């Protein structure tokens, strides 16, 4: 795919993952707290990455090329998809429990943006791609920790209420 069209794959893939969350996760009885959205978003993203990796590896020209592709994608594409799933889940969870539409838009457009940047940069430099990916991992980790912190406060508040009687 020419590099000027490489961003389209990220837009399409993240739209598909977002659609899966909207159609299948939003109405689950088990989806009862914001952290669940991160879990489901990451699960959907890693499932997608698995299918995508099978396609790349099994459609390569030789066994040596398959190993090379699998190795590179294990350290770049899989973390990318996981991070995009965390970001999508974080903002979708905020949307689901607050109703603020801006969170819904962020849950779709931020992963699209990061995925498009990743795809575009892979056409130029693996080193720059890895640096962008490291920054993305840091961002996704900070969002996850923010939810974990909020959740621990909720748990402590519930424990306090239960201990009072």
Identify the function of each model-found stretch.
Residues 1-165:
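Hydrophobic alpha-helical segments at protein termini of multi-pass membrane proteins
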């Amino acid at each position: 795919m020419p590099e000027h069209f490489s961003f389209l794959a990220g837009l399409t893939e993240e739209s598909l993952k977002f659609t899966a969350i909207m159609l299948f996760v939003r109405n689950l009885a088990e989806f009862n707290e914001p952290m669940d959205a991160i879990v489901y978003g990451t699960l959907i993203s890693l499932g997608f990455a698995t299918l995508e990796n099978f396609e790349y590896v099994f459609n390569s020209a030789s066994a040596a090329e398959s190993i090379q592709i699998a190795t590179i994608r294990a350290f770049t594409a899989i973390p990318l998809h996981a991070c995009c799933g965390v970001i999508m889940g974080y903002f979708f969870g905020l949307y689901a429990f607050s109703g603020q539409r801006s969170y819904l838009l962020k849950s779709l457009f931020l992963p699209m943006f990061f995925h498009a940047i990743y795809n575009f940069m892979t056409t130029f430099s693996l080193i720059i791609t890895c640096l962008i990916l490291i920054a993305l991992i840091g961002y996704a980790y900070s969002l996850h920790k923010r939810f974990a912190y909020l959740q621990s406060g909720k748990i402590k508040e519930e424990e306090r209420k239960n201990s009072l009687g």
